[in-house]
Amino acid sequence: MVKMRKRLAVACDACRSRRVKCDGQRPSCMGCLSRGLDCSYQRLPEPPATRLETELANVNMRLDYLAMLLSRQSQPQAPPPVLLASARPSSNPLSSHEDSPFRLLATDSIMSVLGLEDHFARRLVQLERASLLASTTTLSRMFFISHQQVTDALIAFSERVHTFYPILPLDFSERYFATLSGPLAPSCQTCLALLVAAIGCIARDPTMGDEYFEAALASLPTVLAECTLASIQCLVFLSIYYCCRLKPCQAHDYCLIASFKIQNLFKSELSVQLDVATSDTWKLDEYIPLPNCRYTWQFSCPPLPGNLAGVSPESASSSSSSISIDSTNSSTSTASDQAQSFFLAEIAMRRMLHRCNSAVAQSSDGRFCYAPSIALELERQLEEWYDYLPASIRFVREPAGGSFNGDQSALSPLSTFLNVQYCCCKLSIYWPAVYQVIQDDKATPQLLEHCQRFIDSYVQLLPRIALAIDKCLIYKWTLSVTFFVTTMAALKVANTAALRAAQHERLHESLALAGTVGWKNTEDSPSLELLRLNLSQHLREAKQK
């Protein structure tokens, strides 16, 4: 143990200024007493906390967090704390801005502007939480595993899910088939293989996959107890499973647990890598437990598209031997480059989505109003983001007033999702102009021009988001809520008298098309069912006017 050096004698201020030796006596040293001087000492700094004290403080913090979670479980009928916090006035100065009607988000203020009932947004959360308490399942691990079914599930998982979250190791195919051919003993590897099978079955048929998921839940205590890379992968895929099942609250809960485990894993890794000179931190050594982003799993499928009858676990695991090494490395490199390009573009897009509602200025009397110069700058940054997109994830940017190109249905799910975010960002940039007109009940030429840009953005968004809801399985619930909010906002524009001078022909055509968009496979989500019924009612009322 390293002993900290303690300084017992400290010179007083008078002796220090005169640069003479001080005996350190309290309250007055002998030198000051003999000379009749005021003797005062500087206050010693508090010693830093020891490692043991720091660890104990962290343990107490985690125990307090667990106690809070247990107290919530003991009161299942109480509304979530976030709802209680939003029900009363908050002292946080940001809360009023985040719930501002200038921000096109699913908040109470926006729902009120769009003509919906009070606390409509919170009712969606309450419906999802209530469905969680009602949907209790019994675990059943005894079921027959078809090799053909798990192979088809792995192919569907690779095509529709893994492109968004490429976090599996290179040898996952071998582990997957070996695990599902074994006794399914509770472990993180068993849970991971069963979750991939469950998600893949949902990707092929939304009515399948329950038996694999129920079997995976038998390993949940092990997953929660461990803090390994495999346990984090299981928690991420548990969140993805609930996203595919349109249960956002459960998905969010497991995502939070995974986030805490990732932070702990990084802390433990950094603590053993402090000896930088001898560590492999800068070498990206493959033996370090942290994940490596350079190589991820890719499922190489030799048969023709649509013909899965000839696929077997043996052919899937040995397909690399039938393909040349150069072509395999090329396809893996291309997929890896596409994934990395997507995540870089997604990070930049998320930052823009956080500030795309900021085209608002505060006047001298404290009133918020639309700031057109900020909106134009935000749109310039958005176009600059598009110009930097690589060809592997680039989508076709339609000009204002242009028609939708049906060939975009051949885009990858990654490009389709980015395309929707691009249009949503434009909508959010110019929504403050629309709300300014609604608030003032009049439109200046500049406001009218920017409201027209909002209309053009919605016209471009509608066919793309309808396509993305079917293609982007993981984000189906999020995209459905976005479709509802943006369509309700477009209805508000169409019914605003001050905006009649804008070109509404294509807007009315798009709203008529929105009424034909099917909410497929959303029956199990009470919140989406409520959104569907409300949107259908408002579209019918608008059509009758």
Curated annotation (Swiss-Prot):
* Keyword annotations: DNA-binding, Metal-binding, Nucleus, Transcription, Transcription regulation, Zinc
Q: Which residues bind DNA?
A: 12-39
| InterPro entries noted in UniProt | EcdB-like_regulator (IPR053181), Zn2-C6_fun-type_DNA-bd_sf (IPR036864), Zn2Cys6_DnaBD (IPR001138)
Q: What Gene Ontology cellular-component terms does the record carry? A: nucleus
Q: State where the protein is found.
A: Nucleus
Pfam families listed in its UniProt record = Zn_clus
One annotated GO molecular function is: DNA binding
* SUPFAM superfamilies from the UniProt entry: Zn2/Cys6 DNA-binding domain
Could you tell me which residues belong to the region Disordered?
Answer: 79-99
Q: Which residues cross the membrane?
A: none
Which superkingdom?
A: Eukaryota
Q: Does the keyword Manganese apply?
A: no
This chain's protein is named: Putative transcription factor ecdB
Q: Which gene encodes it?
A: ecdB
